Amino acid sequence: MSNVPAELKYSKEHEWLRKESDGTYTVGITEHAQELLGDMVFVDLPEVGATVSAGDDCAVAESVKAASDIYAPVSGEIVAVNDALSDSPELVNSEPYAGGWIFKIKASDESELESLLDATAYEALLEDE
């Protein structure tokens, strides 16, 4: 079973979301997602300043197996991207919940968080796959 940190929120598309002290949210892909994709070779990051809607594809993770869209779990403005992934995309594999984060978003409608999964619900989703 994959590591599913209890303090995070999750999407059904295998993104995770962590609220930061400044009110923004850090987004990445889950350990389960990176295990399915395999070794990362490139991450196409979104543009800082871009406005996205929940469910929009806004980044791409390319691995030795496949290219997979990464979706915005909430609507808002992209306020930062993880530039370290340009040189070290493997951080998504080795540290999916830490150094392998993908972007930070300032949510425009925090009520959208209610549609995300908590750790227990995400674990149940994984068991059903």
Curated annotation (Swiss-Prot):
GO BP terms, alphabetized: glycine decarboxylation via glycine cleavage system
CDD domains (alphabetical): GCS_H (cd06848)
InterPro entries per the UniProt record, alphabetical: 2-oxoA_DH_lipoyl-BS, Biotin_lipoyl, GCV_H, GCV_H/Fam206, GCV_H_sub, Single_hybrid_motif
Annotated keywords: Lipoyl
Pfam families for this protein: GCV_H
Sites bearing N6-lipoyllysine, chain numbering: K65
Family statement: Belongs to the GcvH family.
Biological role: The glycine cleavage system catalyzes the degradation of glycine. The H protein shuttles the methylamine group of glycine from the P protein to the T protein.
Oligomer status and interactors: The glycine cleavage system is composed of four proteins: P, T, L and H.
Name of this chain's protein: Glycine cleavage system H protein
Organism encoding this protein: Escherichia coli O6:K15:H31 (strain 536 / UPEC)
